[in-house]
């Protein structure tokens, strides 16, 4: 399969997150030992985007993983402080520029923490990289990421 690598399961966010996490556990697509992490942190949306959408899909996934694993979920440790344009049509360099200074981590909450960062999709890794850098800058000891899907290769559609 080329393009997006997924778990081959349709995701209808609010209604199916619990089922998806149970399915991941059943399929052994799961981190068996979450005890190496102190907190689960979802990639944040800007408050305006969250109001517009009505939910943060990464937060819903993180909350369900926390519920199933008994781990602490800390959605307030990382905030999106700058509204950014959508990333969907941007390449790696443009995504990186688009996300400069977009995130702030709470240094008191992050200090000394080993963090599992959760997102729904990883395309170029720019969002996860900026979040990781900000959490480490704020004093986190380590940051690892868990995503449900990633784009293996981004193909350009159209000519030019």
Feature annotation, model-predicted:
Residues 1-9:
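Short, small-residue-biased leader/transition segments that mark boundaries at the very start
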Residues 8-117, 124-160:
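Conserved PRPP/pyrophosphate-binding segment of the phosphoribosyltransferase/PRPP-pathway fold
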